[in-house]
Structure formats: structure tokens, C-alpha cells
């Protein structure tokens, strides 16, 4: 084993309050939408189908905008501000300050790096992964990063993994 790749969202980082029920209420209010925060968990579950990758695995921002729109709709949000609200949610997802690193991430990356393993990131995000590494001080550990928004295809399309393997200079059987 020469390399280990990590996903970013919900593997290395988790969203803060901005992307919880009250955060979505605030998004809605800024766009003239009233939402019921009690419906947030069910809304996220219902909206999750919008994120499923179909046969066309190309990265399309609209998939994520639809997710935000659906969450707001499932929370009762209706009105002309819905589209702008969904787009703001999408844009804000890229802001590193809205996320926290899981507390075991740095120690784990440090240990793996010390063992001589190459570490990489593969993410279906539009967040700049260089900015992500800088914000969370991960540059010393990460040897390469590929996001679907810049590479063009979302996981599990083979090409995003091939791009990541190439970036680290390893073969598939040398990586996890």
C-alpha cells in the first residue's frame, strides 16, 4: 500500500450550524421564505435523492442546487425567492469556515503520513480543495487532491479515481 484517498465532506469535515435547521431558516428568511425547522431532518432525507449520481456522472452544479431547493421546499418554503435561496446554499457550501474538522482527522493523517503513505483527497464538491487544505492546515499531509467540479466527473465515475491515482503517481492496486 502506497496511498490512501479520503473523501472530504462527512469524512474529514462536518457542516456547522449554517447547514443545520436554523441555518436553513436563515437562508430562507434572507429570500423571503418561511420554513419549519422541525421538518429539517425529514427534508434532508427527502432531498437526498437529488444527489444520487445517475448514468451521466458529469459534475453539474444544478444537482446540488436542486438539493438545497428541495430541502427548503420540504421545510415548507415557497415563493419567488426559492431559486436564489437554493443557489446561495450551494455557494455557501464551498466556504470552509462553515465546517469543522473531525477531531481525529489530523492525528490520523499525521500518523499515516509518518508511515510514508501518500495521502490524497477525492471529493464531489465545488469547494477549492487547496483552500480547504490551507484552512484546516492539512497541506503537510496531503499529496494531491481532485474535486469533481474541476475534474468533470463525480464519484463513482472511474475517471475521477484515475485522475487521483495519476496525481499521486500510484497504480490502483497500490491505493485504497
Identify the residue ranges that each predicted region occupies:
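Conserved Lys-Pro-Asp/Glu-containing loop-to-beta segment of HAD-superfamily phosphomonoesterases
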Residues: 154-176
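Short amphipathic alpha-helical segments
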Residues: 17-18, 133-135
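Substrate-recognition element of Asp-dependent hydrolases with the DxDx(T/V) motif
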Residues: 83-134, 146-148
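Short acidic capping loops at alpha-helix termini that bridge into adjacent secondary structure
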Residues: 36-39, 140-144, 172-176
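N-terminal helical cap/lid subdomain that shapes the substrate entry/recognition surface
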Residues: 1-103, 115
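Hydrophobic "anchor" residues on beta-strands that sit immediately upstream
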Residues: 3-5, 120, 176
Amino acid at each position: 500500500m502506497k496511498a490512501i484517498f479520503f473523501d472530504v465532506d462527512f469524512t474529514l469535515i462536518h457542516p456547522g450550524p449554517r447547514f443545520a435547521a436554523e441555518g436553513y431558516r436563515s437562508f430562507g428568511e434572507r429570500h423571503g421564505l418561511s420554513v419549519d425547522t422541525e421538518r429539517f431532518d425529514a427534508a434532508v432525507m427527502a432531498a437526498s435523492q437529488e444527489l444520487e449520481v445517475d448514468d451521466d456522472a458529469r459534475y453539474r452544479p444544478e444537482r446540488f442546487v436542486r438539493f438545497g431547493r428541495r430541502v427548503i421546499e420540504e421545510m415548507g418554503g415557497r415563493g419567488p425567492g426559492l431559486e436564489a435561496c437554493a443557489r446561495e446554499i450551494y455557494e455557501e457550501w464551498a466556504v470552509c469556515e462553515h465546517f469543522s474538522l473531525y477531531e481525529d482527522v489530523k492525528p490520523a493523517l499525521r500518523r499515516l503520513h509518518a508511515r510514508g503513505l501518500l495521502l490524497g483527497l477525492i471529493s464531489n464538491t465545488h469547494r477549492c480543495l487547496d483552500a480547504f487544505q490551507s484552512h484546516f492546515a492539512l497541506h503537510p499531509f496531503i499529496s494531491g487532491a481532485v474535486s469533481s467540479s474541476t475534474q468533470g466527473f463525480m464519484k463513482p465515475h472511474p475517471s475521477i479515481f484515475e485522475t487521483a491515482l495519476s496525481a499521486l503517481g500510484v497504480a490502483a492496486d497500490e491505493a485504497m
